[in-house]
Structure formats: C-alpha cells, structure tokens
Swiss-Prot record:
UniProt catalytic activity: (S)-4-amino-5-oxopentanoate + tRNA(Glu) + NADP(+) = L-glutamyl-tRNA(Glu) + NADPH + H(+)
Residue sites binding NADP(+) per the record: 185-190
Annotated residues for binding of substrate: 49-52, 105, 110-112, 116
Protein name: Glutamyl-tRNA reductase
Gene: hemA
Organism expressing this protein natively: Legionella pneumophila (strain Lens)
Length: 424
C-alpha cells in the first residue's frame, strides 16, 4: 500500500479556487464512487472544509488525482497544478497527522478539523471506499493526533473572543447547565458565544434585540425567550451571564441598573461581557462586588497570550509528530510479518491439537498417563522442530553463516543455554 494525501488548502490556494473544488454534501457519494472508478485508486476518503479539500487514498500513481480533480470540477489541469500538493508514504502520513492535530489549520490548534476528518473517514467506510488498507492508517492517525493534542496542550488556550469568553464564564461558574444567559443584540460574535455556551450545556436563554425578527431567529436556534430592549431592566436579575453587542451610540446598562439586579438576585455573581464598540455597559459597573465585567480589550489580551502559548505548544507538537511518525513506520513495517506470524502460529496450533487428541485417545484406552505424556511431549517437540531443523541443516550445507546467526537470534539459543546452565 502507498498512502497518498493530495489536495489544496488556505495556504496554497485562494478562496476562488478553493470554492470551486469544495465538496458539497450532495456530491459526496458520487465523487467518492467516481474516484474509486479509477483503476489506479484502491481505497479513498475525501475531506472538504472551507479551508481545504484533500484526498487520502491508496494508490501507486498519485498523478491521476490531480487529473481527476480537474476533470470533476471542470478546471484546467494546468491551473489546478499551481495550487495542488501531493504527499506520499511517510510524508503523506506526516501531513495528515499535522492536519488532524490542528497544526495545519488557519487557527493553530483548532479542534474542529479532527472531527471533520473523522466524519469523512466514517462516511467513506459506510460507502465502502475505505477498507482494510486505509482503515488501520486512519485509526492510527486519530489515536496519535489525540495524544499530540493532549501532550502539547495546543488547543488549551483561547485564540478567539468567543472561546475566551466561554473559558472565563467556565472559570466563574463551574456548572454551565444551571446558567441563565441574557443575549442583548444579534451580532456574529455574540451569537457565537451563545452557540458555544449552548454546546457546553446552557439551555436557558433570554434574547433581546432592537430588531425583533433577529431576536426571534436566535431564540429559535437556542430555544430561548424573545424580549425587547425595553424589557432589559425587568429581566436582568434573572441573568447569570449577560452578553451585550448592540450598535447603540451610548451605554444603556449602568451601575444603578446592575446594582438593582444584584439586590434582587441576593448578590449572586453576574458575568457581563460587553462586545460592543462603543460600549453598551458603563465601566464603573465593575466596581460592584460579585460583578465580573469584561470588554473586547480584556478578551484581546487573553487572545494574544493564548496565541503565544499555542505557538509554543505547536513547536512541541511538531516534535511529537516526528516521534509518532517513527512509531507509525515501525508499526507499518511490523504488518509485513503479520501474515507469516499468523500462519506459523496456526500451523503450530494444528500440530499441537493433533498430538493432544492422539494422547487423549491413548489415555481413554487405559494406557499409563505418564507414558502417554512423555510420548506426547517427545512427539510434539519433534514435530515442532522438524521443519526448522531441515532448514538449519540446509543453511549449514550452503555455508550461510549469516542465516545461522539470524536463527540464533530468533531462537535466542544463547539465552536458553544460560538458563540451562543456571538450572544445572
């Protein structure tokens, strides 16, 4: 088997090229089937995201992949070749490990790519385009990339405002499930924070927007309650977390409003995230006890620190990839002996069963058990060593000292001799 990773990504191709070769879900089955129709391709899976389209396959002629991609997407082969990369064998495994570990992502260490690769693999398995050759390779890559991410900590530090906000909320409130979140405004970042919180188990959302239609859409997404901007004073005491991102020219959440909400909450802690510029929440709100107010600048400093830490983690992850790559090479080489080992063990098992059945029949017939066991052990030793003995004699006749040395290593005769000397 020759493992090949072929494709293009955000580093090698502009978006107007990437979007032309992006794999639409409705096309997935037909494209995989078309790829497997190529006589040169034995097995394959296709990963397609907004930042990359990659083919992972077993083929001895990887040049057919670029031709196939160009034909399927009605592109010039000459044009596509400018953006295409092809990694074979060890380099193909290394590239795929880097992708799965998040090292090749636009945002270093992002976790989504591993899940996307697993989905692509599972779909190919269901379709039957990944079988015995690629299956163990993918399973190894998934295990190895998980170890790399865990040991390097590459995904541990926030590198987006939304992710940083969710981490801060998690530090203040240990249980996401019990939180009530008040979302004011319907901007992209605020919605993304709400999405992440929902994924972490938050189920109670209050949503207010100057445009009622936008609030209703978000409420449907998160199964929340739709409110108007005028409802904020009434419902603010119910919120453990407030995320505000409107386009108001002046702050509309002031210290007295939050202080009143705290009194009604019996001074239970509140987390306020102001994503608006200009700000929606007055800065002196942070003077109140049990109030944790963060704005965009606060989160940006966290992100810059997180990026530095991720870059350091990426250096460690690259070293871990080299180690995992060595492990893969050893594992893959060991597969070449798998059939020989299996056949040899089956042969030995068959011989042992034959001799065991012969001995049991003699014991059932009333023969002396000790005599039968002695004969059994002698016959078993003779049968197990018959073929190796013939081979060793042939090596000696042919003056193949190199093979005799190999036999000494395989049979570990030196160790056995030392053992016999200790026993005697």
């Amino acid at each position: 088997m020759v493992f090949v990773a072929c494709g293009l990504n955000h580093k090698t191709a502009p978006i107007h090229v990437r979007e032309k070769v992006a794999l639409q879900p409705a096309m997935q089955d037909s494209l995989l089937s078309s790829l497997l129709d190529l006589p040169e391709v034995n097995e394959a899976a296709i990963l397609s995201t907004c930042n990359r389209t990659e083919i992972y396959c077993d083929t001895n002629t990887p040049e057919v992949l670029g031709n196939w991609l160009a034909h399927e997407h009605q592109l010039s082969e000459e044009l596509l070749s400018q953006f295409l990369y092809i990694h074979q064998g060890k380099e193909g495994i290394k590239h795929t490990l880097r992708v799965a570990s998040g090292l090749d992502s636009m945002m270093i260490g992002e976790p989504q790519i591993l899940g996307q690769m697993k989905q692509a693999y599972q779909h190919a398995c269901r379709l039957g385009t990944v079988k015995t050759q690629l299956r163990p390779v993918f399973e190894y890559i998934f295990r190895a990339s998980k170890r790399i991410r865990t040991r390097s900590g590459i995904g541990a530090n926030p590198v987006s405002i939304a992710y940083a906000a969710v981490q801060l909320i998690g530090q203040l409130f240990k249980n996401y499930h019990s939180l009530s979140v008040f979302l004011i405004g319907s901007g992209e970042t605020a919605s993304l924070v709400a999405k992440y919180l929902h994924q972490h188990g938050v189920h109670r959302f209050l949503i207010a927007s100057r445009t009622l239609e936008n609030a209703q859409k978000l409420a449907e997404t998160f199964d929340g309650k739709t409110l108007s901007i005028g409802d904020i004073p009434q419902y603010l005491p119910l919120a453990d977390v407030v995320i505000s991102a409107t386009a108001c020219p002046l702050p509309f959440i002031n210290k007295s409003l939050v202080e009143h909400a705290l009194e009604q909450r019996n001074h239970a802690p509140m987390f306020l995230l102001d994503l608006a510029v200009p700000r929606d929440i007055e800065g002196n709100v942070n003077e109140l006890e049990q109030v944790h107010l963060y704005n965009v600048d606060d989160l940006q400093s966290m992100i810059e620190k997180g990026m530095d830490e991720r870059r350091n983690a990426a250096l460690q992850a690259e070293q871990l990839i080299e180690s995992e790559l060595d492990n893969y090479i050893r594992w893959h080489r060991s597969l070449r002996a798998k059939d020989v080992i299996c056949d040899y063990r089956n042969q030995m098992h068959t011989l042992a069963q034959q001799e065991l059945q012969r001995a049991l029949k003699k014991i059932s017939a009333g023969q002396n058990q000790q005599d039968v066991l002695n004969e059994f052990s002698m016959r078993l030793v003779n049968k197990l060593t018959h073929n190796p003995t013939i081979g060793l004699r042939q090596m000696a006749w042919d003056n193949r000292e190199d093979l005799l040395d190999l036999a000494r290593y395989l049979f570990d005769t030196t160790a056995n001799q030392s053992l016999y000397e200790e026993i005697s």
